[in-house]
Structures are given as C-alpha cells and as structure tokens.
C-alpha cells in the first residue's frame, strides 16, 4: 500500500484534516438548521457510501510516533472497494434485478367464532391493506412500533409464512412467488442468532456456503466467498473461535449477530435482501459499516432491500432511499422517499420535536400524533404574516383539538403520495419479464438452484461428525459406561450354570441389559432441542431438504449405537457365560443395538411433537416405562388381560426380549438344585408316606429345558423366530423414524410469544408526590490500585521437544489507577484484559495469582467483605424466568438488605429502581427464559442492573452492559447507568466500541492493550482530554469521528516502529499525575468512612429462606403445564398398572405380582426423577450468579429447594400409589394402616430418587452427562435392589452394593407390609403334579401357600423386625443425598473465572 499516491496523500493529511474540520462544522450547522438537508450534507461526508470516489472510500489515520518524528506511517482501510469488485465480476451486464409490487396485501390468522357472529371476526388481521414497491438498487427502511408487524411483513416477502393467509396482490417481477427459487434468491436475516455452539465461525460459514452456493460451484469459489464475508463483516480474527453458548465460552453477542448476517450473505444471487433488526448487538459504527456494505450490494448486484431497524442513527437512516412506517394493527402510515417524509408529515400538521432524532419521530408518531403537532410553527407563521392557506397546509385539515384522534392510516391512503405509488405499480417493470432474468453469472443451463440429496447429505453428515468430534467427552462417557456396566452386570451374573435360578437370571440379565441401552440414549432429547431452532432457520432458508437432514441424524446414531452395543456385549456376554456361539453373540449385539435405536426413535418422536425440552423430558420416561412393562418380563404375556394385550403387541421391547431370550435359552438343558426341586428338601411332608398325606420322598424338577422357561413367559421356543423378531424390530425402528421425519417436516412450534402479565392485588397506599423523586443520596467509593499484576497457569506446546509444558500467562502487567464516584470505562480490544481487571478489582477471580495493592476508601480489599457494599452485573443476563420484573428486584432486596431497612423503605427503593431504569410499566411482566419468549434483551439487561441496585451498593461493576443491544437500546441502558452514577455511586464498566453519545457519558477512562495501560485519566468535555493525549503522540483524529472508535483503533493497531502507546502513556503528564496522587494518598477525601460490615450476609437467614421458598414456589405454580404433566405422568401409568393387575387374587400369580408391583412403582419414581435434571442444571446458573454476589448461603438454597419440591414429590407419589393401590386390591390392613404406611414408604422412596437426581445435576457439568449418569444410578438401584437378583443369589463380591442402595430398603419394607402372614392358594392349573414312585398315584403341590414363602425366596424373611427401622434408613438416605448436593453446590462451580 505504500505507493507514491499514498505517501503524497499522507503528506497532505494535516491540511485535509483542517479542511474536513471546517466542512464537517458547516455540515453540522446545516443539519441543525434544516432536517431536510440531511441527504445533501451527508453526500459531502467522506464516509458516504454513495460516493464511489476512491478517496472517499478510504479512512486514513496515522500510527503513533513521537511528535517530533519527521516521518509518519499510515494504515489505509478500503471500505467497500473489494466487495464492489467482487460483485461486478459476477453480475451480468443485462441483469434486471427483482421488482416487487405489493398491492393492498393483508395477512390474517383464521380463528374460530361463535354462531351468529360476523365472518369478519373469524380473521385476526396482523397486516392490513399495505401497498408499496421495491426496486433494484434501492433500500427501504422499515420502521414501526413494537408489534406493528415489521417482522411479519419481512416474512411475507421472504415466503416464510406460518399458519396465516395472505389477501391482496404480491408479485415478484410480475409473477407470483416461485417456491423453488424464491429462498435461493432471497437473503433473509432473522432477529434470532441461532448457531451450533461448538462449531467455529469459519466452519459455520463454510457449511452455509456449501448449502447456499450449491454443488455446481467449485470449492475454491466457496472458500473465496467465505473469506470475503469474514473480511467484510470484521470476523476474520475470530474465524477459528467457536460460536459458544452459556456452557461454552465463544464469541461475543455482537459477533454472533454478524455471523447470522454472514450466513445469509454466502448466497450466490442476492436479488432480494430482507433484514430484521440486523443492528441488534452492534455498536453504531459497526451497524453503519454493515448497512453500508448492504448498500453497495444493492447498487452493484441490483438487489431490492428492506431492513427493519429500531431507532437508527441519522447517518444510518441516510443510507436508505425509501421509508416504510407501520402503525398499530399492521397499518401503513407512510411509504415514500426519505426526502419526502418530513414534507408529507408537515403537510398533515406533524413534525419532529426540536433536536429530536428523525428515527425516534418515525418510531413514535403513530402512537402520539398530538405530541408532534406543529402549533409553534403555526403561531410563528401568523406573526410573520402567514396566510390561512399555509396554516391549512400544515394542519392538513385536522382539527387542532383532535389531533390525537387523527387517522394517520386514512390520511396516507388518501394522500397524493400513496396514489402515485399505486399508479407506479402498473409501470414498474415490463409485463413479459421472466423471473430468471435476475440471475447471477455462472449458472449452468437447467440449474434450478437445488443441490442433489447426496450432496446435501454429505455435508450434513460432515457437520454432524465435526460436532461429535468436539463432543468426544460425552461419547467417551457413554462408551466407558458401556464397558463398565458390561463388566458389572457380567460379574453379577458371572458364569451362570444351568439351575432353575440360572435360567431365570438369564431373563433378568437380558431385560436389564435392554433397560440399560434405553437410558443411555435419553440425552438425544437435549440434542434435538439444541438443534431445532437452527434447523427451523435453515429449513426456512432452503439450505437443504428435510429428508437429508433427517437422514443425517439417523445415520450418525447407528455407529454410536453399534459401538456401544459391541463394547457392552463383549464384556457382559462372555463374563456371564452365555452360549459360546458366534451367531448367538451377533444376535445379542444386534438386540442391544436395536434397543438403542428404538429408544432413539421414541425420544426423537416425542421431542418432535412437543414444544419444549422440559415437556419431552417428562413424557419420554412414561412412554418407555409402559413399553418396558408390556415387554413380557415384568408380567408374562400369558397373564396380560385382554384389554391390554394390544399394547403388548405394540411394544417393540417385547420383540427385543423375545429375540434375545430365545437366542440364549433355546436348546439348553436345565436341572434343579436340591432346594429347587418340588417339593423342596426342607418341606415337612416330603418324606411322609402317601397314605399319611406325604410325598414319600418324591420330587420333580419343574422345568428341564430352555423351551419350558420360554413358554412360561410366552416367548418363542424356536431358533428361527429370532430372525423374524429382528425384521419386526427393524420395522418398528423405521416406523418411529418415519414418524420423526413427519414431525421434522410438518410440525413447527411458533417460538414468539408475548411475555406474560401477572395480575397482582395492589395494596392501597397514600401516595406522596415527593416519593417519586430519588431521595437516596449514596456516598460512592474511592478505589485505588497500584502495581497490579495477575498471572494464570497454562499449558503450551514446546516446538523443540513436541511436549506440553506448564507456563504462566501474565494477563495484567503493572496496572495503576484509581476510580472515584462517577462513571469509569474500562476499554480495550478483545483480549486486552478489561473483564480480567474488573474481576480482579471485584474479588471475583478463583484461579491464578494476584499481586499488588487494591484499596477501597483506603482499606485493603482483601480484608473486606466486598459483596456487602458492591454490585456486579455480569455480561450474561442470568435471570429467574418465572418471576416478574418487580419480583426479581424485590427478591434481591429481601435477600441483601439488612433488617434495619423497614418494609416501606424497601418498597420505595424498589419503586425508585424501577423508575430510574424505566421498568415501571412492565414491572408485573414475567421475565421469560430468553428474549424470544420473554422481555427484550435491553430490558433483561436493565433487570440485571436493578437486581444489583436492590442491594443498595456504593460501588457497581458492569461487565459489557451494552453487549447484544442495538445502539438505541444500549443508549437507554447507559442513560439509566448514568442516573445511577449521578445518585452518588461509583460505577465501573467494561465496554466495547460504544457510540459517541455513550462514550461521552463516562468521566474516567482506563484503556488497556494486552494487559498494559495505554491511557488512564479523565475523558474531558466532549472527550477532549483523551483525544488531546493521543493526537499529541502523533495520531490523527478526524473531527466528528467517534472518539471511542479512534482510541480502540490505536489499541488494535499498535505502531510497527517507534514508541509504543503504553510507553508513551508512562512518559505523559497523565501517568505522572496519577502516580503522584496514588503515592500521596490524596485521592480519598477526608471524612470518607471505610465500609464496615459484620458477617458475610446482610439479611437474616429467615428472610433469605422466606424469599427463596417464595421464588421456588412461584417457579412451580407458574408452570401449570408442567404440574399437569407431573400428575398425568404418574396417574396414567397408575391406571395402566392398576388395570393390568386388576383386583389381584391370592393365587400363585397374585403372590408373585405383588412384589413386581412394588418394583414397578420404584421404576416410575426413578424415571420421574430424571425429568427434573434439565431444570436443576438451568437453575444452577442462577445460583452461581447469586452466590457470587453474596445473596444467600448454599445451605438455604438447598433447604428452600427441598421445601418447594416436597409438594411436587407428594403429587408424584400420591397420584401413582393411591389409584394403583385400590385398583390392584392390595391389602388395606386394620383401619387402613397398611395403605397409609405403604404410601409413606413410597413417598420416602420418591424423595430419595429426587434427591439423588438433584445430586447428579448439581455435580456434573452438562445436562446430557447428568442424565446419562442418572440413568446409570437408576440401573444400579434396580440391579442391586433385590428384585432382579434375590439377595441369596448375589455374588459375595457384590453383596455390599445390595446394602448400599436405598431401593433395597424400600422394596423390603413394602414387600413385608404386603406379604407377611398373607395366605395364598393355587388354582387348578397352578398346582405342581408330583408322581408317587411305584404307584399310579399323583399328588398336587402348591408352591406358595403363604406370603412368607415369597419373602423367603427373595431373602427378606429375616427383615421382619426392620420394617419400621427402614423408614429411618430411607429418611437418612434422603438427608445424605441432600447434604451431598449441598457440598456439590458449595464447592463445585462449573462456571470458572
């Protein structure tokens, strides 16, 4: 770049700078005098995008060197030149572009009406009779109040309609919308930034380019497009950084927004560009940069553009050619050229207020037209001799007393401007133009813009495999679990023999292995919901067809299922001693893999047809457990009542267990041990003579072959049926995945919902006008820091040895400064150390080493409980979704204010906070889980600030308070912050690229670069002090430029030669003055007290507990759908089980089924507990934030959780046990004591399951891993509880585990309660027939004549005396799990700083 032209231009820089000063001043004056001259003035601006002059497309600034240097280097930045050339090379000369005409279009949603009502009421209109045109090369700015229909209009133009219908005429190049090409030709940037968190920026854009550009475009051209987009949107330096989310740290909110924009701009033919609030999260300079590039694309590619913006700056507004304003109800207020906007509104008697931004006027004129009536101009014209005709023109015929009732819609509809628009539609474009006339170069003949299914599938698989590689830890846990559980189960059934018990154990092992492979896949629910929003966006943009996406999900699951099955089977099969045949082993592996795929199918189908992950997590376990019950193991198919036999046939698990059981047992011979023969060896009548009623020593072995056992359960007793079962199972798998495909293709849940309003009863209070004023005046803090250094341990690759070695990274280097009451900005480029410095000052770092001196009001911070008088607003707005705005702030106040604060003072404080933050109108609105389903991003940030203000702090830290906000929302937030600072507090903000208006609100600035200070001091009036510092160093500042952008570019582009910015600062007067003040200790004024507090927490424990319990309860009751599902999830299975075992008799079957009933109740309890894991993990992040702020201690959080969860546990226990108990006819006992006792025991078991799931959720890092480990825990509880394997048959090496699991004590207690002393009998077909040797006689034998016999078989006969003690043991388990959960919460933090 350093050619002669550049050098010549650099030498003239000082003169140009002075000229620019004068020109800009003149332009500013013109702008103030007449708003209508904005466009003309901006044409003179060097940054005007419409000017193609090379000089005007370049910003020149100088690298710093000492002021005396004779040579000054420069850096030249070309804004849109590369982009323009790139487009020109690819656009045909005769390209016409896309003309859009909308003639009286309306959009409505059909709704049901009552008989007799008008048909008009059956249509809910969201857009109403809108007419406008879009022309290639022109840009339309779409404005309107929230809810006016801006997003909806863009979706209509983008052919992204929901359930509604369109009326009117909408044509593209005089043709109806072409479903096959419209999305390919249209760039649509939605409001939501939804990306795969673990992919890098480049990987995300490469995938978009492959989908958008198609298989006919070379890899080189795709890569070139990605590089161009990265460069044009300023993402090149973050191209290899992952996107990130709340669990994985990645790029910033503003950068995510730019990635969303970049995704769409990888398309080949941008003929129609639609952007829905693209500036959200971007500062004003970046917003201007992005829209200016869109302007270039519009001109060079002949694209038609419509962009909705929320209060854009004047410079941004002037980039647009036309304005379209929507009013309430989706009505058109104005459409026309920007130059005609003010004259039109003036003609109807309306105009902006003095010094009011034009965007604000456009946004609000439809709400309060009376506010903008030109009364003063009318009076002025009268004084100046203006005639009546001019007055009439200004008022537009409106009655001055009724301006607020003006029908702006009707006025515009009848205006000459609108009539011209309608007339122009007839002559917009030639009638014979083809839709294909606007295509870009290099499209082959016959190319319809679609890639082949094979191409789409290939890249979808590649993307999914990338994500799987990144998530290798999760899959490693699954594989390790498969090996571990294979060894555990194998060793538990080690080398099974051929006794009767060994035969039954084979069934138990098969069933349990099947259950294990079901619960390892439940994490797919979370995976589906993570990808759903991304898929919906890409589906709308026609990135790929539904089928390749569905196929990629299925294909990537098959190898995982197969590997998991092989690992498990290789351990379990051979250790347990199954048949040593290759075909049997392969069938066993196939059985486990198919079980895995069946579970995947069930979970995916449920997820596709439910709206939220929590609902799917509640429903999935209930469905799977019903299939498990009907599999034929828990209750034989021969015993299932006729009204439920169809469910047995529909249970895919029935065919799995049939296949694997027949595969193992068919062809085997079994015998009886002495105690297994009938009658048993210890039976009193065994050796008694037949004449005396005995058996004369005769015994039989009831089952001698594997077929006998298979027939007992109703399973197939042949070898070929296993292959038939495999085909049937594959049919189920295909059916489930086909239904899943239908759900993916046709089911779409609309995410946009208005935040919920909570109606609260207001107490009547006498209002005093004085109370509206902010009465509190705080004494801010004076913070000083000297010689501050911060190092962290790290690992680095040694290039010489190739090994990793431990190193230390110095993140802060010799930082000195002080902060006084007011606002101080911590600024610097990415990685400069802004957030690090603030965390160090706020005592928030939990890793690394800090050295130096930090004091507040003269006292060392390390000796202070800083959370008592400081507030810290984190960058991520982690809020309780179900609380209202007021309740969230009130919760913080009640937990963090001392008891000396009277209730009326708390209410006043909260009212003041709401007023200062402009949240009063929405104080009773629920916050919601995210900006899509709750309050906006800006209001969420305000609530975060309000929560910290509720602690009445003297010093407030704010980490990137404008992150993710557009320029207007950021300004509103910072206005609130300024009010806070003006109340006497000290405010410290990290902030990245603020607008000029925001930057000038700060009193102090500390600028960092790579951990070093390059400026510290006052900002000065209009930032004059900081600008003077850098201009004196040789940097050139252009008048009118944002000072924040100026100093950040200095930090981002250090000089290649000469003195560094940090060295120059150390030689400056600012540095010497600050060091002198620090050393002389004159910063803290006399009389300023040191904050002194006793204890870590301000509020008493009772107040904190009360607030936590109240919040926890509101979290439950404001999710009525979840409560209903909890009830139905227990009640429906209870009805199924109750009718399955309806009115149990005291026969042999009834005896065995009683214990099975108890175990099934445990199974449901365990499944129910897994459903709460996602909620706990999400709520955990709220605790981390509040704990860091010193809101309450961990033990109160756990205690409150127990108290508020207890009613839900009672609901779960009662809604299952009560209907099941009475339907099955279990024994009531005297005065019903057995019923109440068993209900109490079951409740304790449910509490143990819930507390164990809570422990896993608090201990483990992510939802999938927590659910996976919870499943393993449930497997252990079932395996060692004493049902699958009676305690007498558990190997000696595992007996300790039997006594360790709480399910043992619950099963034992309930079984004894139900069976002890209960008589049983045999039906005629249930007797065993014993032949008497040497005679022709036989004698019947009834195996179970008393419940004690069943208890003996399960090894529970010695536990009679422990029946009531087990209640204490179960309570102890609940307390132990709760205490371990407290320790996990207290000492394990998955959000590292």
Swiss-Prot record:
Domain ABC transmembrane type-2: 473-698, 1121-1388
UniProt cross-references to SMART domains, sorted A to Z: AAA (SM00382)
Statement: the UniProt record of this protein carries the keyword Secreted: no
Subcellular location: Membrane
Keyword Transport: yes
Binding site residues for ATP: 144-151, 828-835
Membrane topology: Multi-pass membrane protein
Pfam family membership, one: ABC2_membrane
Region of interest: Disordered: 1-68
GO molecular function, one term: ATP binding
Ranges annotated as biased composition (Low complexity): 15-50
One GO CC term on file: membrane
Keywords: ATP-binding, Membrane, Nucleotide-binding, Repeat, Transmembrane, Transmembrane helix, Transport
Transmembrane spans: 479-499, 509-529, 558-578, 585-605, 615-635, 640-660, 724-744, 1122-1142, 1157-1177, 1206-1226, 1235-1255, 1265-1285, 1364-1384
Entry-linked PROSITE patterns: ABC_TRANSPORTER_1, ABC_TRANSPORTER_2
Gene Ontology biological-process entries: aggregation involved in sorocarp development; sorocarp morphogenesis
Family: Belongs to the ABC transporter superfamily. ABCG family. PDR (TC 3.A.1.205) subfamily.
Protein name: ABC transporter G family member 3
Native source organism of the sequence: Dictyostelium discoideum (Social amoeba)
């Amino acid at each position: 770049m350093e050619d002669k032209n550049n050098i010549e231009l650099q030498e003239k820089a000082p003169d140009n700078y002075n000229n620019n000063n004068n020109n800009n001043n003149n332009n500013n004056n013109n702008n103030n005098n007449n708003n209508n001259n904005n466009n003309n003035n901006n044409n003179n601006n060097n940054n005007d995008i419409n000017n193609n002059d090379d000089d005007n497309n370049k910003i020149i600034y100088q690298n710093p060197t000492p002021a005396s240097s004779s040579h000054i280097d420069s850096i030249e930045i070309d804004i849109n030149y590369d982009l323009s050339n790139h487009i020109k090379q690819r656009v045909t000369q005769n390209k016409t572009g896309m003309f859009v005409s909308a003639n009286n279009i309306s959009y409505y949603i059909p709704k049901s009406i009552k008989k007799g009502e008008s048909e008009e009421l059956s249509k809910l209109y969201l857009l109403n009779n809108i007419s406008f045109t879009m022309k290639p090369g022109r840009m339309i700015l779409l404005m309107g109040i929230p809810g006016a229909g801006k997003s909806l209009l863009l979706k209509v133009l983008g052919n992204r309609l929901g359930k509604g219908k369109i009326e009117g005429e909408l044509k593209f190049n005089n043709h109806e919308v072409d479903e096959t090409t419209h999305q390919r030709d249209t760039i649509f940037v939605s409001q939501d930034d939804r990306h795969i968190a673990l992919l890098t920026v480049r990987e995300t854009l490469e995938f978009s380019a492959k989908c958008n550009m198609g298989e006919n475009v070379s890899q080189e051209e795709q890569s070139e497009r990605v590089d161009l987009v990265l460069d044009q949107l300023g993402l090149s330096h973050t191209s290899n950084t992952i996107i990130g989310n709340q669990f994985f740290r990645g790029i910033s909110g503003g950068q995510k927004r730019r990635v969303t924009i970049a995704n769409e701009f990888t398309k080949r033919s941008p003929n129609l560009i639609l952007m829905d609030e693209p500036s959200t999260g971007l500062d004003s300079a970046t917003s201007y940069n992005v829209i200016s590039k869109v302007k270039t694309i519009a001109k060079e590619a002949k694209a038609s553009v419509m962009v909705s913006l929320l209060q854009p700056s004047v410079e941004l507004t002037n980039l647009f050619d036309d304005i379209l304003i929507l009013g309430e109800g989706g009505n058109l207020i104005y459409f026309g050229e920007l130059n005609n906007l003010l004259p039109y509104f003036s003609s109807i008697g309306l105009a902006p207020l003095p010094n009011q931004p034009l965007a604000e006027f456009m946004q609000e004129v439809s709400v309060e037209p009376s506010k903008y009536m030109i009364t003063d101009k009318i009076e002025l014209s009268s004084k100046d001799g203006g005639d009546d005709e001019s007055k009439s023109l200004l008022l537009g015929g409106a009655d001055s007393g009724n301006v607020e009732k003006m029908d702006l819609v009707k006025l515009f509809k009848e205006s000459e401007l609108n009539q011209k628009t309608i007339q122009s539609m007839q002559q917009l474009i030639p009638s014979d133009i083809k839709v294909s006339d606007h295509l870009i170069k290099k499209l082959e003949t016959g190319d319809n813009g679609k890639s082949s299914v094979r191409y789409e599938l290939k890249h979808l698989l590649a993307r999914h495999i990338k994500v799987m590689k990144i998530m290798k830890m999760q899959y490693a846990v699954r594989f390790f679990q498969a090996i571990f559980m294979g060894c555990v189960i194998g060793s538990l059934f080690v080398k099974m023999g051929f006794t009767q018990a060994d035969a039954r154990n084979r069934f138990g092992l098969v069933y349990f292995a099947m259950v294990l492979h079901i619960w390892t896949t439940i994490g797919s629910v979370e995976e589906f919901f993570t990808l759903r929003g991304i898929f919906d966006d890409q589906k709308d943009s026609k990135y790929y067809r539904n089928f390749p996406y569905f196929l990629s999900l299925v294909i990537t699951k098959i190898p995982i299922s197969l590997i998991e099955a092989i690992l498990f089977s290789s351990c379990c099969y051979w250790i347990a001693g199954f048949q040593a045949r290759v075909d049997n082993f392969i069938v066993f592996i196939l059985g486990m893999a198919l079980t895995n795929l069946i579970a995947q199918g069930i979970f995916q189908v449920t997820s596709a047809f439910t709206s939220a992950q929590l609902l799917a997590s509640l429903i999935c376990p209930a469905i799977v457990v019903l299939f498990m019950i009907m599999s034929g193991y828990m209750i034989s198919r021969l015993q299932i009542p006729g009204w439920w036999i169809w469910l047995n046939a529909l249970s895919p698990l029935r065919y799995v267990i049939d296949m694997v059981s027949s595969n193992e047992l068919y062809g085997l011979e079994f015998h009886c041990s002495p105690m297994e023969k009938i009658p048993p060896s210890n039976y009193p009548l065994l050796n008694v003579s037949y004449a005396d009623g005995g058996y004369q020593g005769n015994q039989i072995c009831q089952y001698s072959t594997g077929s006998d056992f298979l027939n007992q359960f109703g399973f197939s007793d042949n070898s070929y049926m296993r292959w038939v079962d495999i085909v049937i199972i594959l049919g189920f798998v295909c059916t489930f995945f086909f239904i899943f495909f239908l759900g993916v293709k046709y089911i779409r849940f609309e995410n946009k919902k208005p935040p919920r309003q909570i109606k609260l009863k207001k107490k009547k209070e006498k209002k005093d006008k004085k109370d509206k004023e902010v009465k509190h005046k705080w004494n801010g803090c004076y913070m000083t820091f000297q010689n501050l250094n911060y190092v962290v341990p790290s690992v680095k690759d040694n290039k010489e040895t190739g090994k990793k070695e431990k190193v230390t990274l110095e993140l802060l280097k010799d930082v000195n400064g002080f902060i006084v009451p007011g606002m101080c900005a911590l600024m610097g480029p990415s990685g400069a150390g802004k957030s690090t410095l603030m965390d160090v000052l706020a005592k928030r770092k939990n890793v690394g080493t800090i050295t130096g001196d930090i004091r507040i009001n003269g006292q060392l911070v390390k000796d202070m409980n800083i959370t008592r008088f400081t507030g810290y607003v984190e960058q991520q707005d982690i809020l309780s979704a179900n609380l209202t705005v007021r309740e969230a702030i009130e919760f913080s106040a009640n937990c963090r204010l001392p008891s000396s604060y009277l209730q009326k003072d708390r209410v006043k404080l909260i009212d003041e906070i709401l007023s200062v933050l402009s949240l009063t109108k929405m104080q009773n609105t629920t916050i919601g889980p995210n900006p899509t389903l709750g309050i906006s991003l800006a209001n969420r940030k305000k609530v975060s600030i309000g929560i910290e203000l509720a602690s009445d702090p003297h010093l407030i830290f704010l980490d990137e308070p404008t992150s993710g906000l557009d320029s207007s929302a950021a300004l509103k937030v910072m206005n609130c912050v300024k009010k806070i600072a003006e109340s006497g507090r000290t405010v410290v903000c990290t902030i990245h690229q603020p607008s000029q208006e925001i930057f000038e609100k700060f009193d102090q600035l500390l600028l960092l670069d790579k951990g070093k200070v390059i400026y510290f001091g006052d900002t000065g009036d209009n930032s004059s002090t900081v600008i003077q510092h850098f201009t004196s160093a040789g940097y050139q500042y252009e008048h009118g430029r944002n000072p924040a952008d100026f100093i950040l570019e200095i930090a981002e582009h250090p000089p290649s030669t000469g003195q560094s910015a940090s060295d120059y600062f150390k030689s400056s007067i600012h540095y010497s003055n600050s060091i002198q003040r620090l050393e002389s200790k004159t910063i803290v004024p006399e009389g300023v007290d040191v904050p002194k507090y006793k204890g870590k927490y301000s509020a008493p424990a009772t107040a904190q507990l009360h607030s936590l319990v109240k919040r926890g309860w509101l979290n439950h009751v404001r999710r009525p759908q979840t409560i209903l599902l909890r009830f139905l999830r227990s009640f429906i299975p209870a009805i199924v089980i109750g009718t399955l075992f309806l009115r149990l008799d005291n026969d042999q079957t009834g005896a065995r089924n009683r214990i099975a009933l108890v175990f099934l109740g445990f199974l449901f309890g365990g499944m129910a507990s897994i459903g709460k894991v996602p909620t706990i993990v999400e709520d955990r992040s709220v605790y981390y934030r509040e704990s860091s702020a010193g809101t309450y201690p961990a033990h109160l959080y756990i205690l409150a959780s127990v108290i508020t969860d207890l009613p839900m546990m009672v609901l779960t226990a009662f809604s299952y046990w009560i209907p099941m108990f009475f339907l099955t006819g279990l024994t009531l006992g005297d005065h019903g004591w057995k019923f109440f006792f068993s209900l109490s025991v079951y409740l304790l078991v449910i509490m143990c399951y819930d507390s164990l799931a809570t422990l896993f959720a608090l201990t483990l890092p992510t939802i999938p891993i927590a659910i996976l480990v919870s499943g393993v825990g449930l497997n252990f509880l079932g395996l060692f509880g004493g049902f699958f394997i009676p305690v007498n048959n558990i190997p000696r090496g595992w007996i300790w585990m039997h006594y360790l699991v709480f399910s043992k004590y619950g099963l034992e207690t309930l079984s004894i309660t139900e069976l002890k002393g209960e008589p049983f009998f045999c039906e005629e077909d249930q007797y065993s027939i014993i032949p008497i040797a040497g005679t022709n006689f036989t004698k019947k034998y009834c195996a179970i004549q008393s419940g004690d016999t069943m208890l003996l078989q399960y090894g529970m006969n010695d536990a009679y005396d422990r029946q009531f003690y087990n209640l204490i043991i179960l309570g102890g388990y609940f307390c132990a799990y709760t205490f371990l959960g407290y320790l996990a919460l207290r000492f394990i933090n998955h959000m590292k700083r």
